[in-house]
Amino acid sequence: MPPKKAARPAQENISLGPQIREGELVFGVARIFASFNDTFVHVTDLSGRETTDRVIGGIKVKADRDESSPYAAMLAAQDVAARCKELGITALHIKIRATGGNGTRTPGPGAQSALRALARSGMKIGRIEDVTPTPSDSTRRKGGRRGRRL
């Protein structure tokens, strides 16, 4: 008599994201760092401890001069939004950051397009906040006593 085959247990669905009810929003935090050299789109959970996904504009394009372009930022944001949907995150709070400190306090060209790409890809937008670091009193700015001469 041949040996009996062990009964296979029914396969369970394993979800990576949080357990939620239908129609409930699950928030994450999208931190967009837009300098004039590159754009970072970094999504974490609400506490900021666990990174869900991080994509950089320089990864999405080949030419160095295009790293900070709005197009590269848009591609990065679309990738991040797709990954968030896989994990069950449906809404994002946005924190936009420029270089700050002794650098410029104006976000680079990729900030606006990254935000628009997140919104157009179906993510609900919660709060939008500017978290550029501003010095209360810092080290001396470059340029010398008479400033930058053009």
From Swiss-Prot:
One of its GO terms (molecular function) is structural constituent of ribosome. One of its GO terms (cellular component) is cytosolic small ribosomal subunit. One of its GO terms (biological process) is ribosomal small subunit assembly. InterPro entries: Ribosomal_uS11, Ribosomal_uS11_CS, Ribosomal_uS11_sf. Residues 126-150 are annotated as: Disordered. SUPFAM superfamilies: Translational machinery components (SSF53137). It is found in: Cytoplasm. Keywords: Cytoplasm, Ribonucleoprotein, Ribosomal protein. Disulfide bonds: none annotated. Its main location: cytoplasm. Residues 141-150 have a biased composition (Basic residues). The keyword Cell membrane does not apply. Component of the ribosome, a large ribonucleoprotein complex responsible for the synthesis of proteins in the cell. The small ribosomal subunit (SSU) binds messenger RNAs (mRNAs) and translates the encoded message by selecting cognate aminoacyl-transfer RNA (tRNA) molecules. The large subunit (LSU) contains the ribosomal catalytic site termed the peptidyl transferase center (PTC), which catalyzes the formation of peptide bonds, thereby polymerizing the amino acids delivered by tRNAs into a polypeptide chain. Component of the small ribosomal subunit (SSU). Mature N.crassa ribosomes consist of a small (40S) and a large (60S) subunit. The 40S small subunit contains 1 molecule of ribosomal RNA (18S rRNA) and at least 32 different proteins. The large 60S subunit contains 3 rRNA molecules (26S, 5.8S and 5S rRNA) and at least 42 different proteins. Belongs to the universal ribosomal protein uS11 family. This is Small ribosomal subunit protein uS11.
